Amino acid sequence: KRPDHDRHRAHLDRVYRQAADTDIGIAALMVLSGNGTQFIQGLQTGSYRGLHWQSVNIGALEEILRLKAVSHYRKIQQAVSLEQALALSKEFRVLCAARETGAGSIAINRFIADSLTKRAGTDFYQGRLCLVTGNTPREQLFNGDIGLCWPDQDGVTRVWVETVTGLKAWHPAN
């Protein structure tokens, strides 16, 4: 018999992955505690470290993404080493309030990937960021970790993830 999950709720109240020099953890806690409107107001006035509000109409979204996101992610693709690529990958993120709208994470990720893969010709191209969506404690992989596609010493594309014990590589199919 399956447990009745509808009667149980888990609430996360600590943020572990975000850098100490940004307020993304504060942002998440504000939204989770019902202070979303207050958070948006602060975001629009530049009150949070490491977060920038980009208001744009849907018609201009692709141009903004091309100028800001795609240009940054191309720098990751062109990095001279895995270490440089990983450092660059931490400098910029696109956060979306929704998943399945024209300006949601699915559409934005697809646009960025299509812009970057025209040259690469594969789904797992050098410089692609991969989000871990499950927990595998024995492998030190946790939901929300971000990996980076990069070739190993033999030229085989791997997804590299920084863990508490250092960099680890996995085959993209995993």
Residue map of PLM features:
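Conserved helicase motor core of P-loop NTPases
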Residues: 1-130, 136-139
